[in-house]
Amino acid sequence: MTSQLAGFKGTRGTLLVGIGGCSSSGKSTIAKLAVQVLEDAVLVHQDDFYRHDDEVPFDEEYQIGNWDVPEALDMAQFERELDHIRATGRPAAKLVHNGNIDDVGKFGISEEYLEELRRRYRGRISQPVVLVDGFMLYHDDKVAARFDCRLLVRAPYATMKARRASRGGYKTLDSFWQDPPFYFDKFVYKSYAATHARLFRNCDVEDRLVAPDVQEIYNGDEAQITCVLEQVLDAIAAAQC
């Protein structure tokens, strides 16, 4: 984070953009690509607010920690960070990312294309931007309200489950976590459905998004990553003051 902040010119006019979604929806990858295009932007990962391993809620039935509930995060610290950004236009330099993000190089996006996007959006996005990606951005109104622009990245259940299964594991503050075979269904998706149901028609997270202040970004396997990226950039441009 410190290196990202070196050239960031954030001011009190900084646009605070949330890029939320279920684990393996692709939100972190999209956020990482977007920050490469934006002229004056920095990226904050909610994953960096996870608690220590022994503080994560313990599930008695499955005898493992539950990393996918709000209580697994230090939400008070996260909210203070959002308030700090809103007050100063800049994230706290002390934040250090844990590196649990797929390499965006696998998409084969050329530097020429990224430069074309930079030229295209330079005149459309003039405010400094802080992007925040996370899996618990819109479960609580008081957290969601802190964002100037709220984007929700979606993908079908089966797609997200397959993506999650392909990951080797995750670095935590104290160790390395690998999903048990049942983890996506019983923890990841179950928690996402429970905490985000109110945003959808019939409280079904596979149904239509109906929350008026949250914009859907579809990122299924059939979606072209370049189109998804441009949709995010268009949404940020439209959210400017």
UniProtKB/Swiss-Prot annotation:
One of its GO terms (cellular component) is cytoplasm. CDD domains: NRK1 (cd02024). Mg(2+) binds at S28, D47. The active site is at D47. Substrate binds at D47, D48, F49, Y50, W67, D68, R164, G169, Y170. One of its GO terms (molecular function) is nicotinate riboside kinase activity. Belongs to the uridine kinase family. NRK subfamily. PANTHER family: URIDINE KINASE. This is Nicotinamide riboside kinase.
